[in-house]
Amino acid sequence: MKSDNHEILVEKDRFILQRKMEVSKIRMIFLNEFRSYFMKEGFLEVETPLRILSPAPESNIETFKSEDHFLIASPELQMKLLIMAGYEKIFQITHCFRKEKCSDLHQTEFTMCEWYRKDAKIEDLMKDCENIIKKEISEISTFFDGNKIYEINKDLCNSLYKKLNFPFEKIEIEEIYKDFAGWNPIEINDPIRFDIDMVTKIEPYLKNKAAVFLVGYPYYQASLARLRDNKKTAQRFELYINGIEIANGFDELIDGYEQENRFIKELAIRKEKGMNEYAIDKRFIENLKIGMPQTSGIALGIDRLLMVLLCLKSIKDVILFPQGSF
C-alpha cells in the first residue's frame, strides 16, 4: 500500500513539473534579459553572502537563523559596502529568505534583483524599471509567437501589455491616502494604520491601474532611504502593477549617524515584538560614517514580475519547487 501511494505521489510531482516546463523556458529568457540590460548599461554583476551575522534591522521583516548567522532578507548592506569601496553600478540576482506565511504573493525563499547606481536619483531607477519591463514584454511576446503554450493565457497577457503606458504614472502617497483612506499619513504618525490601509484600501484601488509608481512615503516609512528637504517624506518609491507591489527603490541614506539611530529604533521594536535579535552591523555603519556617495538602489521581485507579466495567479506558478508544494 505504501508503494502505491508513493507511485501516485511521484506521478503527481512529474505532472506538475512537466506543466511548468514552458514557464521555465520563459523564466530563463526573462533572467537573461535582466542581465543583458544591466551589461549594456555598464553594470557589474556581483555576488554577496547568503548568510550574514547582522542583517539590516527591519521591524516588519523576520529572518531565518542559520547557526550563528542569519539568511539574508536582502543583500542591501553588502552591496552598499561595495559602493563605498568605489564600485559605481552594480546588480545582483539572488535568493532571499523571509520568515512569512506562504501565499500567492509570498514565499519564504524567493528571487530578488537588486541594483545600485552611484550619483543617481530614484528617477533613474524608475527609468530602469520601465526599460526592463519593455524588454521583457518584447521577449515574452516573441516567445509566444514561436511556441505553443497551454499554461498561459496569451490574450490576457497581450491585453495587459497594451494597457501599460510608458512612462508609468506617479502618485504621491499623501494624495492617494487622502482620496481613498480619508487621512493624511504625512501629517499623522501612525505606521500601523498606514500598513492596514495600504492593504485594505490603497492596493485594491491600484488593481484598476496597470502600472504606477507610488512616491513620497512618510518619514516613518523611510527605512534606509534619505528624507526629502521637507523632512516629512522619504525619497522612496514602490512600483505596482495590477495592484501588486513589484519593486521598492530609495535615494539611499548616506548619513551614518542617522542610519545608526534608525537601526537602534528598529531593533527596539523588534525586541518588543519578540523577533530575532542581532547586533548592528558596525562595519557597515562605520564605513557609512566615513562616507558614501549619492546613490540610489532598488530591490525588484523577480518571481512577482514574471507572474504578473504572464498573467498567472500565484508566484508558485513561476517557481519549480515552491515552498508548501514540495
Where are these regions (language model features)?
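Class II aminoacyl-tRNA synthetase catalytic cores and aaRS-like
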Residues: 1-326
